[in-house]
C-alpha cells in the first residue's frame, strides 16, 4: 500500500493537547521500512547485474545493452575516472545528449566514488559557466560533437570526451572502490532567489530507499519497461533511471524529437510497449488514453494535476500523483487514484516509506487536520544541503523538533492534512513557482532582467493561460523602448527556455504599496495591448489561414497576424508541440524545432510539409454500394426491418438548450454523410442512397415533463414510439427527443443500425460535446476534419474484394468450412417462434477489482488480448454446460481493419461491423494453459480479424469467388463492446438511467421490433460499465428455461475468474508462435522447441 497510515490518522485526529500531537505524529509518520541502508546506488545496480546479466537494461532507438554489457562499459569508464583523480565526493559535470552513453557516464562516476552534476546541453552559455564555476567540478564529461559548447567557457578542470575506442580497452570487472551510502551521489542545480541557480547535494541512501519503494509500493519488476522522459537536469531523470536499473527492468530513452510530437510519442509508447512512465501533467493533458495501450502505471509529478485529468486516465491505468522537492530525493508523498469521485483538487497523498511529513506554523508548531501550514519533510531522503551555501542550508534544513538529532526540510509549500490521511497542496508561501514541472524562483528571473543596461525596475509574476497552464510575465520600467525580440534574446543568454517570460510588458512606473514595495496585485493582466505587437497582417493562403486558426486556439487569442511572434503572444515549448499536433489533423507536418527558429507565420510557412493526402471534405451524395454487413441485414428479410435501431439517452442536470441542440445536430448530420442515407427498392434490389442537404435530415421533438409525476414512463413510451417511426425508404434515419424534467433534461437519440455502430457512437458523442460547448460560447461550430467517406470505403472495398492479394485468404476460409461441423446446442423446448418479443436476458458481472485484473494484469501471462480470455472462458462454459468439445460460434468485430492502403476511416460514421465463424476447440479442457494459448493462436490465424469472410460472400465477383460453401450456421453470437460507458461521460452530459424502448444498444438487450426475428439462439454481449465487466445472455423463453441459461452464466463466470486468477499468478510471460510470426508453426511444435531449449540449458 502507498498509504499505510491513513486509518491511524483518522483515529488520532480528534485527540487533544500534547497527547494528541504525539498520537498525530505517530499516525502520519509511521512509515518505517527496511531498505539496504548500507549500500550505494552502484552496489545495488551490480546486484541486478549478477541476478539477470542478460536482461535488457537500456534501450535508445535501435541500440540496446544488457545489464552485463552496461556494467562492463561503466566499469571501463570508471577506471579512466579513477586514473584522473576522481574519488569520494569529487564532482564531475556531465554534459551529454540523451543516449546510452549518458547513462554509462553517470554509472561510471558513481562507481569511481564521485558525484555527478548534470548540465543540460540546451542551457545558455552563461548558465553552463556558472554551474561549472560554482560546483568547482574537477572534470567535465561530454561528447565529441558537443565540444563546441565549451569553447567559449572558462573551465579549469579536465574535459573528458566519451570515446568508445578509448573506453573499451580497459578492464570491465567491478571496481570495489570503498564507498558508503552517505557519500555524495549527485548535485542538481535548481532556480535560486539570488539570481543564480543553487546546487542541492543528494546522497546514495535516498535512492537506496527508493529502490524498495519502487519494488514494494509501485510494484515495478524486471518485466517492466520504464520510459525515460525527463531532461538530465531534472531530478525526475534520476527517478526514471534507477526505477529501472535497481529493479531489473528496462529503461527506454525517449528522444526530444519524439517528445516534441504527441503523435510520435503515443506511437513510441505503443511500439516499445512501455509499461511505466512519469510525466508532468502539462504534457499528459495532450495525450489520449484510448491511443496508448501498453501503459499500466502513469505517474504525474512536477506540478499540480487536475481532477479532470485523473478522471480521463484512472480507468485505463494505475494513476499515481507524486510530490517531492529535489531536496528530499525526488519523491516524498504519493496518492493513488481510486474509483471514488475526486473533489475540487487532487491530493498529493501521504508520505512514502521512511519519510515524515509535518505541517507547521511559523514557529514549527503542528497544525491541526484541515488547517493550512508549511509542509516540512524529514527522513532518509533528505539532502545533505546546498553546495557552498551554509546560510541557506541552515535556513531550509533546520533541527527537527519532533525527532531529536535529525533535520527537517522547510519546503516553502503550503498544505493541509485532509481527514482521510492525505495531504492537499495549497500553493507556495514565497515567490517560487512551477513552470512545466521546473522550479522557478521569480527573483532569479528578475535579477537577470535587471542586468539589462536600460532596465531600471522589474517584477515577474505567474499567470495561467486559457488552458489553465502557468506562464511567466515580466514587467519592466525603462526610459527607452526596448524591442521585444531583444529582451527575449537577452533573457535566453542566461536563462533556460522554461524560465524565459512569455510576456514582457513595459510600464511607465511600478505600482507601489504604502510601504514603497512593488504592489504585485496591481500589475496589469498580460494583454496584447500592453505588448509590443507589430501591425496586423492577414494570412495570404490556405496554410497561413490554418496556422492562424491553430495559433488562435492554442494561445487563446482572437486575432493573430502572420507577422506576430509566437513567443511574444505567450507561446512556449509545450504550446509549440500542441501546434504541431493540431497540424496533423490537417495532414500537415511541422517540426517543433522550426517553430523555435521561425516564430512568425510568414517565416514558418516555408517549413510546413504535407504529411499525406486529405480526405474529401465536401458533401457526399448519390448511390452507394452495400457493404457486407448491410448485405447480410437485407438477406435476413426481417419482418420489420425499419425498426432495427441503436439508441442512446443522455442526461444533463443543468438542462439542454433546444436552439443550440438544433444547430449542433444540423452540423453533425451535415458533417457525417452516412446519417443522411435512405434505402429504395429498384428492380428487385436494395439501393443505398446518400442524400444531400435537402429535405428533413433528422426529426426533433421536445417534451415538457416538469409538471409530470410519471416522467420515467412517459419517456419510455415516447422513446418506443420514436423507435418504431423510422422508415428506411423515406427517412430520416435519425430521431431526437428532448425531455425536460424537474431534475434536468434527458436527450434521446435513435439511429437505424444500417448507418451507425459502436465506434460511430463514440465519434458522435465527442462531436456532440465539442459542438455544444462551441455553440454555448457563441463560437462557430467546427468539427474535426472528415476522414474518408462511407461511400469511398464501399467503392474501395469492392475493388479489394477482387484483388489478387485478398483472394489469397480463400485457403483459410475454405479449410474452415470443409473441416468444421455445425453443432447444435441443447435446448429445453422446440419452437419455430423466434420473435424478439420472446427474448429474455440473464446477466453476470465481475467486481471492480476483478475487472481491473482482467483489463490490466491478465494479458501479460500469455501476451493475450481480452477476446482471447473471454472466448476461452466461453469454451470452458459451453463444455461444462452442453458437453461440447468443439463448436463454431459467430464473432463480431468492429470491421475497421486497415486493409485498404491510404484509406482512413478513423472518424467515419457508418455500420462497419464484421462477423465471421470462429471455432472453440476444447478437446484438451483439462489443461487451462494450453486452452488459453490455443484460443490465442486460433484467433491470430484468422486473416485480417475475419473481415474477409463476408467480403467473399457478398462482394467478390462470382467468377473469381473460390468454391466456398458458406454452410456454417453458428447458433451462438459473441460480441465484446469494450469500455463504452466512459465514452458517454463528459463534462456536459452522462448516460441517462431511463429506458429507451426497444433498441439494439450496447447493453446487450437486442429487443428491436417485438415482431422482428431473433437471428441467433444465444446472443452473448460483453461490455464495461462503471468499472465492471458485464456479460449478458439473451435467449428465447420458448426455447429455454431461465434456470438453464443461469447455469451457463454461472459456469461462464466461474471459468472466467479461474482464468483471471491463473494468469495473475503466473510470474513469467509465455510466448506462442504468433509472437514470433511463425505462421506455420503449431502450438505443440513450439512447446517441444521450448522443452528442448530448457533441457539444453540445464
Swiss-Prot record:
Pathway(s): Antibiotic biosynthesis; gramicidin S biosynthesis
Domain Carrier: 538-612
Keyword Nucleotide-binding: yes
Catalysed reactions listed for this entry: L-phenylalanine + ATP + H2O = D-phenylalanine + AMP + diphosphate + H(+)
Classification via InterPro entries: AA_adenyl_dom, ACP-like_sf, AMP-bd_C, AMP-bd_C_sf, AMP-binding_CS, AMP-dep_synth/lig_dom, CAT-like_dom_sf, Condensatn
PROSITE patterns the record matches: AMP_BINDING, CARRIER, PHOSPHOPANTETHEINE
Enzyme class: isomerase
EC number: 5.1.1.11
Keywords: Antibiotic biosynthesis, ATP-binding, Isomerase, Ligase, Multifunctional enzyme, Nucleotide-binding, Phosphopantetheine, Phosphoprotein
Pfam families associated with the record: AMP-binding (PF00501), AMP-binding_C (PF13193), Condensation (PF00668), PP-binding (PF00550)
Single Gene Ontology BP annotation: antibiotic biosynthetic process
GO molecular function, one term: ligase activity
Gene3D superfamilies: 3.30.300.30, 3.40.50.980, ACP-like, Chloramphenicol acetyltransferase-like domain, Luciferase, Domain 3, Nonribosomal peptide synthetase, condensation domain
Cofactor(s) of this protein: pantetheine 4'-phosphate
O-(pantetheine 4'-phosphoryl)serine: modified positions: 573
Cofactor note: Binds 1 phosphopantetheine covalently.
Domain remark in the UniProt entry: One-module-bearing peptide synthase with a C-terminal epimerization domain. Each module incorporates one amino acid into the peptide product and can be further subdivided into domains responsible for substrate adenylation, thiolation, condensation (not for the initiation module), and epimerization (optional), and N methylation (optional).
Similarity remark: Belongs to the ATP-dependent AMP-binding enzyme family.
Quaternary organization: Large multienzyme complex of GrsA and GrsB.
UniProt function note: In the first step of peptide synthesis this enzyme activates phenylalanine and racemizes it to the D-isomer.
Miscellaneous note of the record: The racemization reaction takes place in the thioester-bound stage of phenylalanine that is formed via the thiol group of the serine-bound phosphopantetheine.
Protein name: Gramicidin S synthase 1
Organism per entry: Aneurinibacillus migulanus (Bacillus migulanus)
Lineage: Bacteria, Bacillati, Bacillota, Bacilli, Bacillales
Gene giving rise to this polypeptide: grsA
